[in-house]
């Protein structure tokens, strides 16, 4: 039997479009073969190239491979694996952070500029051969070359970066860097824009607020500052028991003598961070803690002008610092609170967790309680337990309607805490933590950006935001207005009390700072 195969389907006829594409592909294939043959010939000719041509081409190739800078959070995350190898570091998980106090605040973690100066974040305690010392008594003169993800790029910039790796410590009366500037007001001869615009009419302000009987506080000295970040969530002003004022302007900390009103020196960290986000003096010495936008917590001795150590672990902006003897607590915008024992090499001794950004940290005067304020409106009271784990339970959690940033413990009455409400609240809250209730809640009709207690006169001073932009003094225990200072045109972001408790340093978003008598 014979089998015969027959075509059942009709013969397919190619269309003009298919024929056109086949023609195009043939041309492309031919061009590709010619290109490959030419490249092979060029490779053979390159054997005769000079060394200068090879060096020039190699340099051009390196310059084209510059890594793109990212935000501080991303940069720290990329280096988490490297920093885990350091004996002076620990990890922090990332979380989504929402900052509701949006009016006029710098709420985003990325810096003001589109680029970020990249610096090495890895620093080991036992690497003296690399020029870094991390002990409590040794000086740290150099930091590592700027870090980059590409190995070739790191090697190409290392030689240039070695000339500018020193942390700058400048000593002069008027300190000026690219980051900022502090200068005493020259009164009638002053050409500062804020002074040329004229002085605010305090009497009109008092009449409009109904407080004509209040006393008007006069400034002892007025200072012009540039580089102050208009960020509601930072804590960049502190006055030490040695009568030294520290204020962060950009990526530098300026040390100012509170007695003779002269600038002493500054600490410039522009090589390692975008800006400084918090400062805090230790109570028992001249050590200054500095938190940065890159998540570092550095300790500086302003007498010896040496950096004592650099404590890593945070992956985001460190916006709050608070001392309890030798325990330093730091809070970040990723909601982590770390306890550091600065006396030991393994400094990380405890962790507390929040769901949102930490805006404020304050240890009570007796050191038994820690209060933390968050951007989600939660005021949390923690027990004294530096070794707390991530599952540490708070003593109390009090819900507020706005972010809890302005906060301070009463120095003469145990368990009393004052917090300032944000723009949507506008109230000063005096809380009895032991009873878990509010004692007084007077309305300020404005955002409260900062506050401090005045023990000499048993009063509270609050730094107001929009629309008042002044400093209001409240008498306790009635919490009624008794006076104010009206020398600022921008919201008063920071307040700090002198060691003798008779003067207040105020810094505002309009680029002015004042020292005024409160006693």
UniProtKB/Swiss-Prot annotation:
WD repeats: 229-266, 271-310, 311-341, 353-392, 399-441, 443-484, 487-519
UniProt biased composition (Basic and acidic residues): 110-125
Expressing tissues: Expressed in multiciliated cells (MCCs).
Keywords associated with the record: Cytoplasm, Repeat, WD repeat
InterPro entries membership: Cdc20/Fizzy, WD40/YVTN_repeat-like_dom_sf, WD40_CDC20-Fz, WD40_repeat_CS, WD40_repeat_dom_sf, WD40_rpt
An annotated GO BP: positive regulation of anaphase-promoting complex-dependent catabolic process
UniProt subcellular location: Cytoplasm
GO cellular component: anaphase-promoting complex; cytoplasm; deuterosome
Compositional bias ranges of the Polar residues kind: 79-98
Keyword hit for Repeat: yes
GO-annotated molecular function: anaphase-promoting complex binding; ubiquitin ligase activator activity
Entry-linked SMART domains: WD40 (SM00320)
Region Disordered: start-end pairs: 79-133
Function: Protein regulator of centriole-deuterosome disengagement and subsequently participates in the ciliogenesis in multiciliated cells (MCCs).
Protein family according to the UniProt entry: Belongs to the WD repeat CDC20/Fizzy family.
The protein, known as: Cell division cycle protein 20 homolog B
Annotated source species: Homo sapiens (Human)
Chain's gene name: CDC20B
């Amino acid at each position: 039997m014979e089998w015969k195969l027959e075509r059942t389907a009709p013969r397919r006829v190619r269309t003009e479009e298919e024929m056109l594409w086949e023609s195009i592909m043939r041309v492309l294939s031919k061009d590709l073969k010619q290109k490959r043959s030419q490249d092979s010939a060029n490779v053979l000719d390159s054997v005769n190239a000079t060394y200068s041509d090879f060096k020039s081409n190699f340099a051009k190739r390196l310059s084209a491979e510059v890594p793109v800078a990212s935000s501080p959070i991303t940069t720290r995350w990329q280096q988490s694996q490297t920093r885990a190898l350091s004996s002076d570091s620990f990890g922090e998980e990332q979380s989504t952070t929402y900052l509701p106090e949006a009016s006029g605040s710098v709420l985003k973690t990325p810096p003001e500029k589109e680029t970020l100066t990249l610096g090495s974040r890895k620093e080991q305690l036992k690497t003296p051969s690399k020029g870094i010392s991390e002990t409590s008594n040794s000086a740290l003169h150099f930091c590592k070359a700027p870090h980059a993800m590409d190995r070739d790029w790191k090697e190409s910039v290392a030689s240039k970066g070695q000339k500018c790796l020193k942390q700058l410590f400048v000593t002069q009366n008027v300190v000026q860097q690219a980051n900022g500037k502090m200068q005493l007001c020259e009164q009638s001869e002053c050409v500062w824009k804020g002074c040329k615009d004229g002085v605010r009419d305090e009497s009109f302000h008092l009449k409009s607020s109904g407080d004509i009987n209040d006393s008007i506080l006069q400034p002892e000295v007025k200072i012009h500052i540039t580089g102050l970040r208009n960020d509601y969530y930072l804590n960049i002003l502190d006055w030490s028991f040695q009568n030294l004022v520290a204020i962060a302007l950009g990526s530098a900390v300026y040390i100012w003598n509170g007695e003779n009103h002269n600038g002493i020196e500054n600490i410039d960290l522009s090589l390692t961070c975008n800006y400084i986000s918090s400062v805090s003096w230790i109570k028992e010495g001249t050590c200054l803690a500095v938190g940065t936008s890159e998540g570092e917590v550095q300790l500086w001795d302003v007498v010896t002008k040496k950096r004592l150590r650099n404590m890593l672990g945070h992956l985001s902006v460190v916006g709050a610092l608070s001392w309890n003897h030798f325990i330093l607590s730091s809070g970040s915008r990723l909601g982590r609170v770390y306890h550091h024992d600065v006396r030991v090499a393994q400094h990380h001794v405890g962790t507390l967790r929040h769901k949102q950004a930490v805006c404020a940290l304050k240890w009570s005067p007796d050191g038994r309680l820690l209060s933390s304020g968050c951007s989600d409106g939660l005021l949390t009271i923690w027990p004294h337990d530096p070794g707390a784990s991530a599952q540490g339970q708070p003593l109390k959690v009090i819900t507020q309607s706005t972010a809890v940033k302005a906060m301070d413990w009463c120095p003469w009455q145990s368990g009393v805490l004052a917090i300032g409400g944000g723009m949507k609240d506008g109230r000063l809250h005096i809380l009895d933590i032991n009873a878990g209730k509010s004692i007084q809640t007077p309305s300020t009709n404005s955002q409260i950006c900062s506050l401090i207690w005045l023990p000499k006169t048993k009063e509270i001073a609050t730094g107001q935001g929009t629309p008042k932009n002044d400093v209001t003094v409240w008498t306790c225990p009635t919490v009624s207005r008794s006076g104010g200072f009206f020398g600022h045109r921008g919201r008063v972001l920071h307040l700090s009390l002198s060691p003798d408790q008779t003067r207040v340093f105020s810094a505002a978003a309009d680029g002015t700072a004042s020292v005024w008598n409160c006693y």
